[in-house]
Amino acid sequence: MIASRRLACVLALATVLFAAFTSPALAQTPAPILQEPQTIPLWQAGAPGALGKADEDTPTLTIYMPPSTTGPMTAVIIAPGGSYRALSMNKEGRLPANFLNTLGIAAFVLKYRLGPKYHHPIELGDIQRAIRTVRARAAEWHIDPARIGVLGFSAGGHLASTASTHFDAGDAMAGDPIDRAGSRPDFAILGYPVITLTEAWTHQGSKTNLLGENADPALARNLSTDTQITANTPPTFLFHTNADTTVPVENSIYYFLALRKAGVPAEMHIFKDGAHGAGMPMQDPALSEWPKVLANWLRAGGFLK
């Protein structure tokens, strides 16, 4: 009964999203039936550095597949926000996943470990493992291993930007085949992200939860991701609001400028109004535009086939 109600909610949401993101003619077409999401642990035998076996100690991926899974599809790993202390799994996880499904994109919502129990590099290790997992199992899931992106909101945006600036090609000699896969995302989508951990416009709560009360200044600089961008940083789409008083828009602006300086393809949209944590604001006349322009960016960049 619970599963039936859950599926009914997913189908109802899919109907709304499908109507919102198609032409009037296509809006009359019945919404596609989305598959029931499945959740898997990132590590079968327990996560490295785990301090217990509770839910909070077990990073997972919840898999949302679009109706057609013939592939090869684009995939996006979603990192919800929550100041590195909680996770907005609905507004910044499930709803974006459902939207991506309407574009034919496979979505994977990441439940990563959080402060104050866990600090860096645990969170980075979790998202890197997620990227490796999707890439290593790309054939099984009908995914193009060269079209795997990350989407992060707020603190999850910081984590996605960290994955975009701190990655490796994998360990070819690893016994675990997942560890042989590279952790570089092919593109990044950052929604009102925390970027700096050193400037006045940082989000102090996210910084403290990630690094602890007495953060090493050198580590804070290394994880201020606008200072870590190179020509190999993946193409990036950013959106923010000028009215955001929780995570000031300077975070996105300085990241964009660093991408531009490095010659990395990037697009940024700054909306005049809107509070922090918008997620998928389908009823907001202004902010409801960001998923539409994101879809255009994905197509223009060749990330949608």
Where are these regions (language model features)?
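Catalytic nucleophile-loop/oxyanion-hole region of alpha/beta-hydrolase
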Residues: 88-90, 94-95, 108-145, 282-289
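Short beta-strand/loop motif that positions the catalytic acidic residue
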Residues: 238-240, 244
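N-terminal cap/lid segment of alpha/beta-hydrolase-fold proteins
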Residues: 29-70
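C-terminal catalytic histidine-bearing segment of alpha/beta-hydrolase fold enzymes
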Residues: 64, 239, 249-305
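Primarily recognizes the serine-hydrolase "nucleophile elbow" in alpha/beta-hydrolase
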Residues: 129-206, 220, 225
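Bacterial N-terminal signal peptides
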Residues: 10-22
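Active-site glycine-rich loops that stabilize anionic/oxyanionic intermediates
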Residues: 80-85, 242
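Short beta-strand element of the alpha/beta-hydrolase
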Residues: 72-81
